Curated annotation (Swiss-Prot):
Biological processes, Gene Ontology terms: immune response; myeloid dendritic cell differentiation; positive regulation of activated T cell proliferation; positive regulation of cytotoxic T cell differentiation; positive regulation of interleukin-12 production; positive regulation of interleukin-6 production; positive regulation of type II interferon production; regulation of immature T cell proliferation in thymus
Full protein name: Tumor necrosis factor ligand superfamily member 9
Region (Disordered): 1-20
Underlying gene: Tnfsf9
Assembly information from the UniProt record: Homotrimer.
Role this protein plays: Cytokine that binds to TNFRSF9. Induces the proliferation of activated peripheral blood T-cells. May have a role in activation-induced cell death (AICD). May play a role in cognate interactions between T-cells and B-cells/macrophages.
Membrane topology label: Single-pass type II membrane protein
InterPro entries according to UniProt: TNF_CS (IPR021184), TNF_dom (IPR006052), TNFSF9 (IPR042373), Tumour_necrosis_fac-like_dom (IPR008983)
GO MF terms, alphabetically ordered: cytokine activity; signaling receptor binding; tumor necrosis factor receptor binding; tumor necrosis factor receptor superfamily binding
The organism of origin for this protein: Mus musculus (Mouse)
Subcellular location: Membrane
Pfam families xrefs: TNF
Classification lineage: Eukaryota, Metazoa, Chordata, Craniata, Vertebrata
Length: 309
């Protein structure tokens, strides 16, 4: 090695004495005032060893330690909390405004009540003819009035075999007799003038008397419907009530019977009372027809018999 080469090496050693190294990038950044970035780079700079000629001759190399913790990432939310709060508030307002739109229902129509026209402005219908139905319960005569009768037992309390007499005048209790029917009191018969299908009913009401104290009387009491002429296909037109010794504990014993009968014009109907009681002397005096809950007999027209139909 010549003398010139030795002089050059001595000059290099004189500028970089032993134990020193070239200033790192971290030192330069620290001198310029970027402290945070200098600290970051200082963690990643491999330490130099001035004793080694290679370290003194070449600049330091940044090497990341795999086991060292990475610096925390920059959190955008932490830097802008007010912006995120404003966005959340706007979303809540939008949701509150949309809820009524999707939950809106159609209003229910108002209830409409149809009332009858004012009587003062009613039209004159005197010249119009209203048709009368021929099927109903009860039905009507040609004049439009219902054919109906209800007769109440008259002047009869004791139980004996007889034909009952009836109240037929309006106002006598609940008795009623319409057109198309008439009652002949002397014969005790109800006469049918309007032919057709009739609903006929009987109601028998009995009460114990004050002499019925022995609890021994028993038997039966009947109401028998009698028709002139006889009604076809009906053999049993009777209402029967059975009485027992214990029956006197009831203040009222009542039974009813009904039947649809086809009656012709001129048919005559009457009701017979039949009784059979035994078990004590004068047993027939222990029971009587009730009053004011009165035994009744009646009928009404269901369907008229019109030959031209």
């Amino acid at each position: 090695m010549d003398q010139h080469t030795l002089d050059v090496e001595d000059t290099a050693d004189a500028r970089h004495p032993a134990g020193t190294s070239c200033p790192s990038d971290a030192a330069l950044l620290r001198d310029t005032g970027l402290l945070a970035d200098a600290a970051l780079l200082s963690d990643t700079v491999r330490p130099t060893n001035a004793a080694l000629p290679t370290d003194a001759a070449y600049p330091a190399v940044n090497v990341r330690d795999r086991e060292a913790a990475w610096p925390p990432a920059l959190n955008f939310c932490s830097r802008h909390p007010k912006l995120y709060g404003l966005v959340a508030l706007v979303l809540l307002l939008l949701i509150a405004a949309c809820v009524p739109i999707f939950t809106r229902t159609e209003p229910r129509p108002a209830l409409t009540i149809t009332t009858s026209p004012n009587l003062g402005t009613r039209e004159n219908n005197a010249d119009q003819v209203t048709p009368v139905s021929h099927i109903g319960c009860p039905n009507t005569t040609q004049q439009g009035s219902p054919v109906f009768a209800k007769l109440l037992a008259k002047n009869q309390a004791s139980l004996c075999n007889t034909t009952l007499n009836w109240h037929s005048q309006d106002g006598a209790g609940s008795s009623y007799l319409s057109q198309g029917l008439r009652y002949e009191e002397d014969k005790k018969e109800l006469v049918v003038d309007s032919p057709g299908l009739y609903y006929v009913f009987l109601e028998l009401k009995l009460s114990p008397t004050f002499t019925n104290t022995g609890h021994k009387v028993q038997g039966w009491v009947s109401l028998v419907l009698q028709a002139k002429p006889q009604v076809d296909d009906f053999d049993n037109l009777a209402l029967t009530v059975e009485l027992f010794p214990c029956s006197m504990e009831n203040k009222l014993v009542d039974r009813s019977w009904s039947q649809l009968l086809l009656l012709k014009a001129g048919h005559r109907l009457s009701v017979g009372l039949r009784a059979y009681l035994h078990g004590a002397q004068d047993a027939y005096r222990d029971w009587e027809l009730s009053y004011p809950n009165t035994t009744s007999f009646g009928l009404f027209l269901v369907k008229p018999d019109n030959p031209w139909e």
